[in-house]
Every structure is written in structure tokens, then in C-alpha cells.
Amino acid sequence: MEVSPEEYYRHLYPYDQLVRLLTQNGDELPNIEFAIEGLSPAGDKFYRRYLSVKTAKELKAEVSNFPHVKTFHFGAVYTGKPSGNVRVSAPVRRVLSFDIDLTDKEWIPLKEGGDISLPLCDRAWPVCAASVDLLRRVLELAFGYTQLLVVYSGRRGAHVHVFDEGAMSLSSEGRAAIIGYVNGATGTDKLRSTSGVHLVMKMHNLRKHVRRLFKTLFVVRMGILDTRQARLDFLARLDLEKYASLSDMTDMLIPEVVDKETGKDAWKCIVQHLEGVKQTSPWVLDRLDCAVLAYVWPMLDTNVTRDIAHLTKVPFACHAKTGRVACAVAADELMAFEPGQEAPSLVSWNQDTMDDALLLFDGRKEAMAEAMAEAGISEAERRGEANWELGEQQEQQEDPEDPEDPEDPEVAVLSDSIMAELERKAEAELSEPDMEDLVGPAPRSAVPTNRAPRQALPRKMTFKRKLSPLVPEE
């Protein structure tokens, strides 16, 4: 059965769950901005911004009665009723959001006949899952953020929302500093990652994890080194030919890698050759890291995170092009998640699929997991999928190809100086004239508030505190 967007938002959208999500930290619902997006008969988008509601029922009425509604968004928490006039009401808080879009990875084939292909996007989901996994690790290890909600976008990406109190209270400058830190103050070089990203990886001892993600997901599962051209492209990212001291090694490396039977063998060959020259040229392993990071590390939209007044599409919105619902994804199901099967779709509506997707929102998922455990049924058995969870013993195993970085106290002390520099750059950038529509927060002492004491985010919406590997070690 096909469902129209109007029917979905009138009868099927979970407004009560959304309101509970956005007010769980004690924020007043009337002070949260909502914006509704419609589509005219001519195909032009139009919006209603600064919408304020008192209840979930009122929000449902506003969205349902909006002409030709396509989706709706939530924005910042204001000092009073949301307004475009900062003298009336100014934005002071917002969920810290990150946007991961597969189109930012130039090596992923997403188009077919000139248009974005949904099956190709589905096939590339592991890339998105790896980006989410690394992002949440950095957010916890660097900033202590653990109250995260991951939402599948409906086509080619994911949104990560942080509900920690400290994250929600950040100014636009603070948000810019965080996105700059995660991005490593990235440049425009798409062939390899910047030294900033490499430093972030080393500071948090993520090299082994990054290598494991690349080998298991990208090389073995996705086959990114299966073809001759793909291997030559990867070697080009290393750019080793211009170093005369490595000429003997590169002369052997290229033909050997090209002739390997599988992508996994090609990857092993590359690692072995570079390990062989690390005594005389230790920097080559850093260059390999940067090439790998270009595939694995998340590439994030700065504007989505930086602007405290930015609008964010609500969880469980329907995607205008695919008809899929932007459903939440549990941290321990990132790799097992299959968008084509598990995301509810307006094109062929199945209420059971929607009910399953809502389990993460309304608290039934945890109860069901406990009941299954008592019955001796594993989640992998229920889903009929591979279980990617690891036990404590597996996590302690060493991968001989990817030795873990030792703790480096000299690297760790660089964190404060990097953050200070990123904040300085962010403040300079935000003072530019073309950012005049970016509204900073009012001083906290001048902001009247009746917010209730902070409530902890329900466990069902958060990542597990323990950061377990996303893929198994071999």
C-alpha cells in the first residue's frame, strides 16, 4: 500500500515520541522552533519558520494542515517564543548535529544514468556506518559526549544528534571548534586526509581501529581493491614515486599489487612493502594512514553543525525522493542495518516495519531484547544476520598487520593548543559580513529560564558507554 506524505504526517508520524526527545533535557516545547516545508504545484519549495507549539497534538495539527507538506524541521531553543528578530527572542541552545553524506566520498559510485541510485546508496551503507562509528568515538574520547542518536537519512547518509547538556549549550563558535577538531581543520585535498585528521586519529589511539575498518569493511566486504584500476588509484594516493629513496621499493610494489588475486592480498602486499622500509623512511606509514583515512574518516557538512540557528530535519521524516522514513539506528546495529529492508517506506507501507523502527524510540526495544535473552534467542538469530559484536577476549587480540599505537603523552598535550587555534579561527570566520544571519547566544545571565532540572537521556537512545569494535578482528 502506498502512502502519501500528507497521509503519513496526518496519521502515522510519531509526534509524541519526537516531543519527548526534544524536551528530555528540560527545554520548554513552546521555545523550540519548528519549520514546515511544502512543495507548490509548480515544484517550488516554500517554508513556514519560527513555528511555536505547546503540545504534540498542536504540532500534529500544524504539520497535517500545512498545504502540500513534504517534511518538517526542528531548530534551536529560544529565550522565548521563536522569532527571526533577535530583539524579541534569540537562539541559545540546540542539539549538536552532524550530517554524513556519501556524496562527499568521491570514490563511491552512487550514480546510474546520471541520477543517484538507491541500490548503490544501500550498498555503500557500510561506509556511512564506519563514519558514524569513528565520529562517536572521537566525540566521546575528546569531549565526553555519550548521549547520541543516529538517524538514517532516507537515502545516502546519516545524521548524528548529540543531546549532552554541554553540547546543546555550545555557541556557534564552540560548535565550529568541534567540527574543526573532528575534521582536523581539513583542506580540499581529496586524494588523502590531512595531517590534522591523522593527528586526531593518533591522539585517540584509533590507528588500529581505522586499519581494521578499512581492511574488513572496505577491502573485503566492499571490494574497493578488487580491480586493477582501483589498486592503481589507491597507490596514487600514496604518491611515493617522487621520492628517489623509495624507487626500488615502488618499482616492485606496483606490479606485485596489480597482479594479486584478491583485494585482500593486494592490501596485505602494500602493508608489507611499506613496513619493510619503515626503518629508513618511517613517514611512509603515516602516508599510508592518510590514504586510508580518506576512505574511512567521516566528511562532515560544517554548516549543519556550526550554526546554532540551523534547521535540522526531524527524525522519522520521510525522504522526498525515496519515500523512505528517516529512522533511528541503534549503535550495536550499525553494520547489520539494511536500509532497503528495515527503513519504513511510503512507497510500500508496512506498519510492522514502522513498529520495529519505533522500538528504539518508545522503549520497547530493550524489553524485547531482555525477553529474547531469557528465551535463549540471540539478536543475530532473530534478524538472520551476521553478529558483529565482539567479546572481551576478541578485543584483546592483536592484529599482526596493524600494531596498535602506544600511548604518546607528547601528542596528547597538543589537544588544548589545537582547540584554542580552532576556536580562534572559528571566531574570525563567524565575524565575516556574510555570516550576518548567524545569531549567537545571549549571555546566560540575561536569559530567563524556567527549564526543569536536566533529565538523563533514556538508555535506548544512546550509544553504549563501552566503545566496542564495529567489526571482528581476524
Regions found by a protein language model. Give the residues of each.
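SsDNA-processing nucleotidyl-transfer enzymes
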Residues: 2-117, 302-304, 320, 324, ...
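Histidine-centered divalent-metal-coordination microenvironment in nucleic-acid enzymes
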Residues: 95-98, 140, 147-173, 313-314
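Long, low-complexity intrinsically disordered regions
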Residues: 405-474
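Catalytic micro-motifs at enzyme active sites that drive phosphoryl/nucleotidyl and oxygen chemistry
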Residues: 82-88, 136-140, 144-152
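Intrinsically disordered, low-complexity segments used as extracellular stalks/linkers
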Residues: 394-410
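Residues forming anionic-ligand binding surfaces in small-molecule and nucleic-acid pockets
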Residues: 87-120, 185, 190, 194-200, ...
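Long, well-ordered alpha-helical scaffolding segments within enzyme catalytic domains
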Residues: 119-145, 291
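Long, charge-rich alpha-helical interaction segments
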Residues: 182-291
